[in-house]
Amino acid sequence: KDITGLGKEFLIFNYDALFMYRSIFICEGAINALTLGERGIALMGKAFSRYQVNQIIKSPCEHVIILLDPDAKEYAIKLALELVHFKKVKVVFLPEEKDVNDLGKSETLKLVYNTRYMQYKDLIELKNSL
């Protein structure tokens, strides 16, 4: 538990971005979210909770770009599957052993722009290919 007395399953770093921007970037950690600027949020790890997913679903943001670390591909796909019926979703796979902070904002955004939005069937195919 953190200083609020809550576990990480109730935390979303930069939560307000969900209500301020049409597009948000979901990262694992706060440093990665900060690298992407005001639209970056963090789930405080690769695992995510039902509470965190519901907060994202209930928010007015329309586009969700998932940028978890390379060792979390399965978690990224699982999160996308939770969100794809409610939001437009991109899953951006980062180069091995690199996270958003390692790449920097400019290189990360190039990857984002070169990644297409995914439908449910695309995510299922991707999940089955891992």
Regions from the language model: what does each represent?
Residues 1-60:
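Phosphate-handling DNA/RNA-contact segment within nucleic-acid enzymes
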Residues 26-28, 62-75:
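Acidic beta-strand-to-loop metal/phosphate-binding motif
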Residues 44-50, 68-71, 94-96:
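Short, acidic/turn-prone active-site loops that include or flank metal/cofactor-
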Residues 57-61, 99-114:
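Short, surface-exposed amphipathic charged segments that create phosphate/polyanion-binding patches used
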Residues 75-86:
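Short, aromatic/basic amphipathic alpha-helical patches
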Residues 89-99:
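A generic structural motif
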